[in-house]
Design a protein with these regions (language model features):
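Acidic, mature catalytic/reactive cores of soluble proteins
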Residues: 1-215
Length: 215
């Protein structure tokens, strides 16, 4: 990296977020997102009227629920809107939806990225979380906040129910079911209800690392 900084500044300036100063513990940050861009992205991402939900980060802003995005292609209008649960279209088999639900794989990568950024910025970068709340925290604490929200998909609430079980008594209270979690493919962006394949032990199984990392 030092060679690129000294000999290829044209490349380094495009891809190294901060060449003028080093970050926490004298680190350099290799990232496509500069500090200004990161702040702007997080302002949207941490807005509870847009991406931030009780159970993680939505795959599309809730803003588009009442304001669908439309575009005209060769006189044909195509529209996409916020759909928090199962797909309302038969496209791609109709059994998957990236227009609103919470996907654990994406949320996990977001958490990992925030922790990497925190390794560079440390406590110096404070972001409002949630947006509009007046509460500011560093990126490490924001990552922890997202991890806790993800855990709320599976943790029992005061009534003994898990959001992912969607109020099904058998799954929440039956002695043969209540302690055995289903690893759903994705989750409703508003309620946390488990959707898609219920045996998605791959990326949804990442919740185990989330729980481990947060204690």
């Amino acid at each position: 990296m030092d060679w690129f900084i000294e000999n290829r500044q044209d490349v380094a300036e495009r891809n190294i977020a901060s060449m003028k100063r080093r970050g926490k513990d004298d680190r350099l940050l290799l990232a496509l997102v500069s500090k200004d861009r990161l702040v702007k992205i997080l302002k949207r991402m941490l807005d509870e009227t847009e991406f931030l939900a009780d159970h993680g980060i939505r795959s599309m802003s809730k803003y588009h629920e009442k304001h669908p995005y439309s575009m005209d292609v060769n006189s044909q209008v195509f529209t996409v809107g916020y759909v928090p649960g199962e797909s309302d279209s038969g496209l791609f088999g109709g059994n998957s939806n990236w227009r609103g639900p919470i996907w654990l794989c994406v949320n996990f990568l977001l958490v990992e990225s925030l922790l990497r950024f925190y390794m560079f910025y440390g406590d110096s970068l404070q972001i409002e979380c949630p947006t509009g709340s007046g509460d500011y925290m560093h990126l490490g604490h924001i990552a922890e906040e997202l991890q806790h929200r993800l855990q709320h998909l599976f943790a029992r609430n005061d009534e003994g129910r898990r959001a992912a079980n969607d109020g099904v008594d058998l799954l929440d209270f039956d002695e043969h079911w209540k302690d055995y979690l289903w690893f759903h493919e994705y989750f409703d962006g508003d309620t946390g209800r488990g959707l898609g394949a219920s045996h998605q032990c791959g990326w949804t199984g990442l919740i185990a690392k989330v729980i481990h990392d947060t204690g």
